Amino acid sequence: MLPAHRTEGEGFSLPQFDLTPCDVDGFLDELQAFHDQFRGCFSRSEPREHCFNYMVGQCSALERKSIEPMALHVDGGNIRGMQRCMSDDVWDEDTMRETYHALVANEMGEPDGVLIVDESGFVKKGMESVGVARQYCGTLGKVENSQVGVFAAYASRHGYALVDKRLFIPEQWFSDAYAERRHKCTVPDEVAFHTKPQLAAEMVRAIRSEGRLPFKYLVADCLYGNSPDFLDAVDACVGVTSLVAVPAETRCWLQRPLTTEKTYTYKGAVRAKRVLPPETQTPLTGAALAQSLASACWYRRMVSEGTKGPIAYEFARKRVTLCKDGLPNRTGWLVLKRTLGSSPTYASYLSNAPESTPLRLCVW
């Protein structure tokens, strides 16, 4: 089911679903039919049934959706059984994910689908859950005691769905001081610290390698656009066009500068490194480049529907070469966005789209 949306030039509005009592009346039967497609992922019937009851509890109107209130709410619920299912029982996660991806592809898969990478935080009151820490929680927009997950979603003209996830475990969790907590949370010994962009890169590689979800485009926010690990994983997806936010201080050249090789001696060995000639122009930041553009370079576009009416921005783009460690790096489109008014604010996005790509492909 898709939300009502504007069809020409203005993107999605606020989601509006037309549900009838008949839609709700048949929900449990549909949920059971959905769950039955994963029967082969469980080795025993008990965890399979507890998993279904857990799903029912998550879809309920309960205010607190922890194990005990959910188990007491659903028919046939068992508190210890549901707790054991979530903490101790084993199921085939790879087969479950592959089965789910096949369902998503069948329902909404398109060759020009979009893969979306982002994170989300979950506020926690206690300190017992794995990965919980005082960290930035995007749900609240501030540092809070929380868990953070990195997620991948799939979208097409037929709908959208979450398709993968990774739990971010903060670096301090891998220190000796947290050894007891890791053991209590049964964190496997082979699990090591990974940054959020590294976790996102894992998902992109896995989804691409699996091959069940067709996608032609990939989008992500600034945290991932500023990560070489993530960008390398995206670039490895041949034929995929990406658009990722990058920091305003990202430096770039409008023309790729030439480099020369300089030799030097280090500990008796002759080595070489690439350097820029002295006359090379200083790279610009994305913000400085945006502010230097004439008004005629900007294109106004309605992007969404707000509570007070349509929301519009102005966009421009330039072909640039990024600066990394003082040297030229990857080349692509720098898509620039600014707010309307006399004192605009700017945002920058990087795309690996071909040179012939029109701006309207990046702004929709």
Mark where each language-model region is.
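Structural motif
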Residues: 42-50, 140-145, 340
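Electropositive nucleic-acid engagement tracts
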Residues: 43-54, 58, 62-127, 206, ...
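Charged, often Cys/His-bearing segments associated with DNA-binding zinc-finger transcription factors
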Residues: 1-32
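An anionic, glycine-rich sequence signature occurring as long contiguous blocks
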Residues: 32, 158-185, 189-193, 243-248, ...
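Basic, short loop/linker segments at the boundary and entry of helix-turn-helix/winged-helix-like folds
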Residues: 24-52, 183-187
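Short, conserved catalytic/metal-binding motifs centered on acidic residues
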Residues: 70-71, 111-125, 152, 218-224, ...
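Domain-level cores of phosphate- or acyl-group-handling catalytic modules
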Residues: 181-263
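Active-site-proximal, Lys/Arg-enriched surface segment
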Residues: 86-171, 178-182, 318
